[in-house]
Amino acid sequence: MDLIETVRPLAKKTDSKILMVVLDGVGGLPLTVNGETELATAKTPHLDALAAESQLGLVELVAAGITPGSGPGHLSLFGYDPLKYVVGRGALSAVGIGVKLNAGDVAVRGNFASLGESRLIIDRRAGRPSNEKNAEVVAKLRAAIPEIDGTPVEIYSESEHRFVVVFRATGTPLGADVSDVDPQVTGVPPRTAMAHDPASERTAHLVNAFVTRAEAALADESQVNGVLFRGYSDVPHFPNFDEIYQLRAACIASYPMYKGLASLVGMDVLPVEGEEDALAGKVAALKEHWHDYDFFYWHVKKTDSTGEDGDFAAKVKKIELFDALLPELRALQPDVLCIVGDHSTPSKLASHSWHPVPLLINSRYGRKDLAQRYTEEEAQKGSLGLRRGTDVMPLLMANALKLQKYGA
């Protein structure tokens, strides 16, 4: 049975509050045989103090050996089996920036990329251009590709190297089962999109035509001169998060994909002031709305971005920046405070990985364990053991006294 259907009849409304902090891609690896991970290297006195008062463990977001994308990783943390509830990155990003998807449309996540001779990929993120440069390039593509063979094409800025394309159905629905253009490595050319079923053949044609026309339109660009696609999606549908858990839930995040996912499961997405991933703005939003909700999903992105860039020192710094503001979160006195990642992004690999992520749960009803720091190694000593991602929400609900007894 789907764990959601087990939890749903047990959930009850209470006044207790849950704060789930997701440090995106927080899990790491040592750079050397006898070295430390980014978490272990970081100076985190506040996380250490919290860990000494909490329960720790490790979480596999999908299954052993499976490297999660951000979408499946978050769905798992929210209690949705990522093998059952599948959604492409395109829909998450589109919804996150306020784009309405209609039945039959397909949204796809795009990366601006740097291409060299023979179309070989030099940089999958085109040097992470500024948001202003992103908007400039999107405007150029909009002028060059308003439609393809009668299919309307909409192009939207997201942030840095990220953008979203929506192919609008004009009759027959477009299929979303298409292979990625993005090979997720450098030194090779973009892949040709291939349909995996007849309904997706037109979508694959549209994608390949877009790639060709985009490269022509960007031929005068020195760095942002190619596009990569992944994460095709039509309109997804999920059981409502608030109804499952009897919560009023809010999302505090900066990046569109995470706001989109939260919106799709039914959370309210709160406005955040300041620069993207500005932690001060997120703290302010949490304080402002603290009395309006009983569940908060609070997201930190840069622990992932720095890992993807292969920048060990920068990832350590982002962890330390979060640690510095942790006392402000604790001062709100949530009944349950959870700190976890949606996947690991070791700087050593410069990509997501299959390694379990540390899980911390602090509540007045938790049993203390032997873990003394919030690190991968210390989490192995924790009383929570190795858990599936879908176990996290039931554990938080139980620690908040929001679950009734199961059975007689």
Swiss-Prot record:
The gene is apgM. Its EC number is 5.4.2.12. This is Probable 2,3-bisphosphoglycerate-independent phosphoglycerate mutase. It is an enzyme of class 5 (isomerase). The keyword Isomerase applies. The keyword Isomerase applies. GO terms for biological process: glycolytic process. Pathway: Carbohydrate degradation; glycolysis; pyruvate from D-glyceraldehyde 3-phosphate: step 3/5. It catalyses: (2R)-2-phosphoglycerate = (2R)-3-phosphoglycerate.
